[in-house]
Amino acid sequence: TSFNSFVWDLNKYINVFVYTFKEKTTAGISHLPYTPRENSLPGLTANNHYFSNMPSYTHCISINNTYITEDDVYTTLAHELGHYLGLFHVFSEQECNETDYCEDTPNYDRNAYTEWLGTLTQPYNFLEVVKRNGCEGESFISTNVMDYFHSYQNRFTANQYSRVRHVLENSPLIPGPKNIITTKVAREDIVPAARAIE
């Protein structure tokens, strides 16, 4: 189902849709942003097409209303907003060979962590399960919003902040102050074409 008829102006709003997913164990999903070719960001697609064209798909964040609970709706929304604004997971799912392009976020093997969780007896000791063994041999407490359970999920790092700021200032289809005039997308059904670029 396309939600394009429900989408508000992507230059002014981040569209969040809440509905029942076919995939029952997914809490949320999000589109990643584009960056201009002239000012790209590692890991994100450089595409100038959306500076002057609206996408044919629904560029948004989606939250699963059957899987999400009252306890984690806030962290799920914050996590999906992180993706929408250019952030990746702070872990690897293929041993330790993935990156989030942020030097100040320790990486760890999520599959190894999940296997370790399977050896524990429930209920878990939260102070034990928030610990991670990093890919460089270090131990740390998981606090990053871009991690999965079990984590405090209440922090971003300086490098993550820089990535988000870059996206806000340079990317099409993202609200926020822009560094260049071409990052505003014309939407004639909302703003007349002559005034669409601010």
What function would you assign to each model-found segment?
Residues 59-155:
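The catalytic-center signature of Zn2+-dependent metalloproteases
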Residues 32-39, 79, 144, 150-193:
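C-terminal/domain-terminus segments
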Residues 7, 16-18, 73, 90, ...:
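Extended aliphatic helical segments
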Residues 1-14, 19-20, 169, 181-198:
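Propeptide-to-catalytic entry region of secreted or membrane-anchored zinc metalloproteases
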Residues 14, 29, 61-63, 68, ...:
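Weak global preference for isoleucine
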Residues 4, 11, 15, 39, ...:
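Detector for Asparagine
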Residues 17, 23-28, 70-72, 94-96, ...:
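An almost-null, non-specific background feature
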Residues 2-92:
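Active-site-proximal segment of zinc-dependent metalloprotease catalytic domains
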